[in-house]
């Protein structure tokens, strides 16, 4: 294919001055506005780190690992993209420097470069450009928004910036747009906005051969027209192409703020795209109004091992918020360090909360504290939601304290346990090495809470796990007619959902429902959990 025959338009988003400016939220917000106007939009994240993917990175380093339907372990920004766009990303939506270099080195070993010296230019840059084309074709996109990780000036980003510089020539001027986000500091003492960091950031970007057509200025105060004109003159940018990204209390306000400033009109004009509908953002306006006028509060205890960095549970936090908004209540999460939970303090730690959630995790650290929390929820009729490891530990807790299987455990924790109620997955997947990754079907059992919540026969949910409930113990667990395996993957005979008949709301799942929750379409399990927690609050 001749690159100039490609019909897709590309928006490249870079960041300057400091990291964590909200490039991902900017990308997701623009994506939602353009989708709303009738365009088919996909978003891609280019990460300059050498890791192949974040799958083996510490949650303290990187936050959560977001899993796509096709089993890719990706950057948490893809969660923002999916939640804002309500579109599924794919493994093509997250590209790392590690993937690029690995691919090029493999091709060199296979002799595909015909003995040439393999260099950053052209081989690495061509590989990056091919990834841009791949995501456009795979998603059949009218517009691909590409976020470049890191900050302009980082040495790791150099090949990516060079590649996106080249695509303007390769794809055509009106098919490419460069958007640069910068910080505009406000000095409270002097009551003055400082533009110098933005000037230097744009200067550095231009030195690399990239002239941004749009600036998005992150600021805690509104930026007056005089300041915008000053930045426009010194950065050689149309004043009409300078937009504010003011600090907001609700992330989704960014969609309305950028649309109100006309960023979508400017983008469509640049791409010479006409005959697209006006944006109808009424549903987002209603959501924001609802959030601003919440009348109740629900308090959830999250008992985890990575609680120092809340981003390790970002999608769970967002899914709980989505469900809470539906019930007109503000979410308050109490972060409980599972390592500090003991039999002596468990009651004082958890007695005041409306619901208890035990999320995922790997390894044996903090396991016993989570099991204590599950036992407390079960024996005190407090709504309980277990996710991934949370389900495995619910199985262990029940085995020990109800079935009296002394020493019951997971093979991940104790390879010599006499009762391995949690074992390694029986059927290996080709995706992600030793992990079961991606979306799989789950058949729901009739006359169960799970079936009532989903109101479907078959559901599809995303997975990321290495261990699971041992199917050889299922009959023993279900013998007393209380413990129910209510969701099963029939193809591989895997236990996906467990629940208790005698408990008001005790459900644990092997998969990650948080990855499918959307602000305008909360996940049914999270809705059910929040509803049960509110009922528990009422009955106290």
UniProtKB/Swiss-Prot annotation:
Residues 306-539 form the Glutamine amidotransferase type-1 domain. Its EC number is 6.3.4.2. Pfam families: CTP_synth_N (PF06418), GATase (PF00117). The active site is at 388 (nucleophile), 512, 514. ATP binds at residues 20-25, 77. Keywords: ATP-binding, Glutamine amidotransferase, Ligase, Magnesium, Metal-binding, Nucleotide-binding, Pyrimidine biosynthesis. L-glutamine binds at residues 60, 361, 389-392, 412, 466. Mg(2+) binds at residues 77, 147. Gene3D superfamilies: 3.40.50.880, P-loop containing nucleotide triphosphate hydrolases. It is an enzyme of class 6 (ligase). Allosterically activated by GTP, when glutamine is the substrate; GTP has no effect on the reaction when ammonia is the substrate. The allosteric effector GTP functions by stabilizing the protein conformation that binds the tetrahedral intermediate(s) formed during glutamine hydrolysis. Inhibited by the product CTP, via allosteric rather than competitive inhibition. GO terms for molecular function: ATP binding; CTP synthase activity; glutaminase activity; identical protein binding; metal ion binding. Residues 1-273 are annotated as: Amidoligase domain. Belongs to the CTP synthase family. Catalyzes the ATP-dependent amination of UTP to CTP with either L-glutamine or ammonia as the source of nitrogen. Regulates intracellular CTP levels through interactions with the four ribonucleotide triphosphates. HAMAP family: PyrG. CTPSs have evolved a hybrid strategy for distinguishing between UTP and CTP. The overlapping regions of the product feedback inhibitory and substrate sites recognize a common feature in both compounds, the triphosphate moiety. To differentiate isosteric substrate and product pyrimidine rings, an additional pocket far from the expected kinase/ligase catalytic site, specifically recognizes the cytosine and ribose portions of the product inhibitor. This is CTP synthase. It comes from Onion yellows phytoplasma (strain OY-M).
